[in-house]
Amino acid sequence: MSNVIASLEKVLLPFAVKIGKQPHVNAIKNGFIRLMPLTLAGAMFVLINNVFLSFGEGSFFYSLGIRLDASTIETLNGLKGIGGNVYNGTLGIMSLMAPFFIGMALAEERKVDALAAGLLSVAAFMTVTPYSVGEAYAVGANWLGGANIISGIIIGLVVAEMFTFIVRRNWVIKLPDSVPASVSRSFSALIPGFIILSVMGIIAWALNTWGTNFHQIIMDTISTPLASLGSVVGWAYVIFVPLLWFFGIHGALALTALDNGIMTPWALENIATYQQYGSVEAALAAGKTFHIWAKPMLDSFIFLGGSGATLGLILAIFIASRRADYRQVAKLALPSGIFQINEPILFGLPIIMNPVMFIPFVLVQPILAAITLAAYYMGIIPPVTNIAPWTMPTGLGAFFNTNGSVAALLVALFNLGIATLIYLPFVVVANKAQNAIDKEESEEDIANALKF
């Protein structure tokens, strides 16, 4: 292990330090860190709604044999409205808040008015957002949530750079020193704001004339090419979900066509075949086949703690990290990670645009998929013949999705151990990389930040 860590340090450490000081990458990282209160609050209520208030058929507690009467279930379902409202105000507006914090963080890197840049980023985001839902004059929630976060990232970075460009050229209104600072500050952002929002308004108008909008173009550019990879759908999903997440794109939502359109129907076909013949052996004897890439297989053996098998990362942090911030994030992310919700670790560490975590985050899922396929074709685990809740903890999900296979439970736990081992050396490297980045800012760094 020490040789592996030494090799990774030699290759990754200089690169990680250099990337860690890159203003745009740093702005994205710091922006997501500031979003963490929203992320954590939203994730907790997703957990409460999908696990602790769910007792109907197909729920976690139902799978454990716990049954409640219909009136109690209806009452609990009604209480989910509380968590739903919190979700709408947290994870449901991630794409709206991302440009504010990212634009603000980049403005701080550039040594210009951060608050003005952040506010203009939000205004620019809403300027290019269509105000129509059917016949109604309204903003669609789909533009504000996690599925559209790449738009928020792009707009936050672009607006902050435009703001910097304008301010550095003194295209601002300057008031006498006798005017209060708060008033002077507001007027200094007037001309930059007018120019930036005019540009965004023209872009929105032009795209609307062509029957589309900025957000839709971003989504189509991501989703359409990947959804066409039907022949290799399983591997495409396993590889591209974490890859998209690394760049701030909600991978699972971007590839919904593969999930809902192909892999979930495969799971339903497996269940129907199992129900018809009563057992996997009887179905195989009758010449029937089962789909290995059914969606619950991914949830059970690959997405351990969420995309990128981040429950393994949390465990690796507890084992190897000495960084107080990493350990605190891991503590906060563990409860939701156990139930397959990993936004706290994705945005809190963050993993997004983190150069040290790129390799393990993207590679861990294909490795776990290969192990799972090997176990399946060797006859160690049976195919998926049930659909347990996606929030089922690691091991239990595999057990229920295979209708009680202990071998499946053990393979899932083995995969979790492998994921932890994959992340371990990178957690150690991250410790040293951050120590180098956290050194006192030099005069040269300040001078570089002021360049455009």
Swiss-Prot record:
<keyword id="KW-0813">Transport</keyword>
<dbReference type="InterPro" id="IPR004501">
    <property type="entry name" value="PTS_EIIC_3"/>
</dbReference>
<feature type="transmembrane region" description="Helical">
    <location>
        <begin position="229"/>
        <end position="249"/>
    </location>
</feature>
<feature type="topological domain" description="Cytoplasmic">
    <location>
        <begin position="1"/>
        <end position="34"/>
    </location>
</feature>
<keyword id="KW-1003">Cell membrane</keyword>
<feature type="topological domain" description="Periplasmic">
    <location>
        <begin position="208"/>
        <end position="228"/>
    </location>
</feature>
<feature type="transmembrane region" description="Helical">
    <location>
        <begin position="409"/>
        <end position="429"/>
    </location>
</feature>
<feature type="topological domain" description="Cytoplasmic">
    <location>
        <begin position="168"/>
        <end position="186"/>
    </location>
</feature>
<keyword id="KW-0472">Membrane</keyword>
<feature type="topological domain" description="Periplasmic">
    <location>
        <begin position="388"/>
        <end position="408"/>
    </location>
</feature>
<feature type="transmembrane region" description="Helical">
    <location>
        <begin position="147"/>
        <end position="167"/>
    </location>
</feature>
<feature type="transmembrane region" description="Helical">
    <location>
        <begin position="300"/>
        <end position="320"/>
    </location>
</feature>
<feature type="domain" description="PTS EIIC type-3">
    <location>
        <begin position="8"/>
        <end position="426"/>
    </location>
</feature>
<feature type="topological domain" description="Cytoplasmic">
    <location>
        <begin position="250"/>
        <end position="299"/>
    </location>
</feature>
<keyword id="KW-0812">Transmembrane</keyword>
<feature type="topological domain" description="Periplasmic">
    <location>
        <begin position="321"/>
        <end position="343"/>
    </location>
</feature>
<feature type="transmembrane region" description="Helical">
    <location>
        <begin position="344"/>
        <end position="364"/>
    </location>
</feature>
<feature type="topological domain" description="Cytoplasmic">
    <location>
        <begin position="430"/>
        <end position="452"/>
    </location>
</feature>
<feature type="transmembrane region" description="Helical">
    <location>
        <begin position="114"/>
        <end position="134"/>
    </location>
</feature>
<feature type="transmembrane region" description="Helical">
    <location>
        <begin position="86"/>
        <end position="106"/>
    </location>
</feature>
<protein>
    <recommendedName>
        <fullName>PTS system N,N'-diacetylchitobiose-specific EIIC component</fullName>
    </recommendedName>
</protein>
<feature type="topological domain" description="Periplasmic">
    <location>
        <begin position="135"/>
        <end position="146"/>
    </location>
</feature>
<feature type="transmembrane region" description="Helical">
    <location>
        <begin position="35"/>
        <end position="55"/>
    </location>
</feature>
<dbReference type="GO" id="GO:0005886">
    <property type="term" value="C:plasma membrane"/>
</dbReference>
<feature type="transmembrane region" description="Helical">
    <location>
        <begin position="367"/>
        <end position="387"/>
    </location>
</feature>
<keyword id="KW-0997">Cell inner membrane</keyword>
<keyword id="KW-0762">Sugar transport</keyword>
<dbReference type="InterPro" id="IPR051088">
    <property type="entry name" value="PTS_Sugar-EIIC/EIIB"/>
</dbReference>
<keyword id="KW-0598">Phosphotransferase system</keyword>
<dbReference type="GO" id="GO:0009401">
    <property type="term" value="P:phosphoenolpyruvate-dependent sugar phosphotransferase system"/>
</dbReference>
<feature type="topological domain" description="Periplasmic">
    <location>
        <begin position="56"/>
        <end position="85"/>
    </location>
</feature>
<dbReference type="Pfam" id="PF02378">
    <property type="entry name" value="PTS_EIIC"/>
</dbReference>
<dbReference type="InterPro" id="IPR003352">
    <property type="entry name" value="PTS_EIIC"/>
</dbReference>
<dbReference type="GO" id="GO:0008982">
    <property type="term" value="F:protein-N(PI)-phosphohistidine-sugar phosphotransferase activity"/>
</dbReference>
<comment type="function">
    <text>The phosphoenolpyruvate-dependent sugar phosphotransferase system (sugar PTS), a major carbohydrate active transport system, catalyzes the phosphorylation of incoming sugar substrates concomitantly with their translocation across the cell membrane. The enzyme II ChbABC PTS system is involved in the transport of the chitin disaccharide N,N'-diacetylchitobiose (GlcNAc2). Also able to use N,N',N''-triacetyl chitotriose (GlcNAc3).</text>
</comment>
<keyword id="KW-1133">Transmembrane helix</keyword>
<dbReference type="GO" id="GO:1902815">
    <property type="term" value="P:N,N'-diacetylchitobiose import"/>
</dbReference>
<feature type="transmembrane region" description="Helical">
    <location>
        <begin position="187"/>
        <end position="207"/>
    </location>
</feature>
<feature type="topological domain" description="Cytoplasmic">
    <location>
        <begin position="107"/>
        <end position="113"/>
    </location>
</feature>
<dbReference type="InterPro" id="IPR004796">
    <property type="entry name" value="PTS_IIC_cello"/>
</dbReference>
<dbReference type="GO" id="GO:1902495">
    <property type="term" value="C:transmembrane transporter complex"/>
</dbReference>
<feature type="topological domain" description="Cytoplasmic">
    <location>
        <begin position="365"/>
        <end position="366"/>
    </location>
</feature>
